[in-house]
Amino acid sequence: RSSDLEYLCNKFRPSVIILVHVLGHSNNMKEIMRLCKKYKIYLVEDTCEALGSKYNSGNLGTFGLASSFSFYYGHHISTIEGGMACSNDKNFSKIMTSVRSHGWLRDFNNSEKKKIMKKNNISEFQSKFSFFYSGFNIRSTELNAFLGISQIKKIKKITKIRNRNFNVYKKELSDFFLVRCKTKILSSFGYATLIKNRDKVYKNFLKKKIECRPVISGNIAQQLFWKKNNKKTNLPNADIIHKYGIYLPNHANQTVEDTK
């Protein structure tokens, strides 16, 4: 709820909000953008599961300072591994370009390099192995790029199929699962719901060779890496998802018959 988010904004005064569009569903972007403007907060969108989804007339991933997308093989499109990051802020985009490649300036043009070198008093010789940002080696390859560019052209078709499959699930399982969706155009990643007898349902799905999973990480504070290093956190709604959440598969190659 927006009131909960505003409470957190008031209490912690964050500089950045990282917003996850879970399984393709949009958040209330109008209200979130209002709060970001009011409290002068940068918005970063995790759009890894929502490529193609829209809120009103805007694509998810285009509202904040930056957004991330995953092209892992199980996602909307695949480059085998990797993904993309987007931003309409030129300076931030340049920083991301550097961070992707160790923090070097090797992907910058000559005038940009000289400007940064002069500002930081770095000689041309030193610049060949100077790390201007704390970076990573997460550069993509021509093969990954070719796969991504060829598939991004199909995203409207992929979105249409995934949305169709979601609606088939919704109709066929209406007596069992209640799912509300307010996303204008939904590029569904999976069909998620809450079930009290989740383990029993999971075993039945396995017998029928139907894959299903927990709703991503559930409550992140229940994950071992967090529990070992942080104080106990009270997140009752996330606990419910952690305990009862489950989602069924959705894919562009999944037919209506497969879904039923």
Where are the model-predicted features located?
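Proline-centered loop/turn at the N-terminus of a beta-strand
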Residues: 15-16, 40-42, 59, 66, ...
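Conserved active-site segment immediately N-terminal to the catalytic lysine
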Residues: 45-79, 94, 127-130
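Adenylate-forming
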Residues: 78-83, 148
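Short beta-strand-to-turn element immediately C-terminal to the catalytic PLP-Schiff-base lysine
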Residues: 69-70, 83-89, 116-119
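Conserved short alpha-helical interface segments
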Residues: 21, 44-45
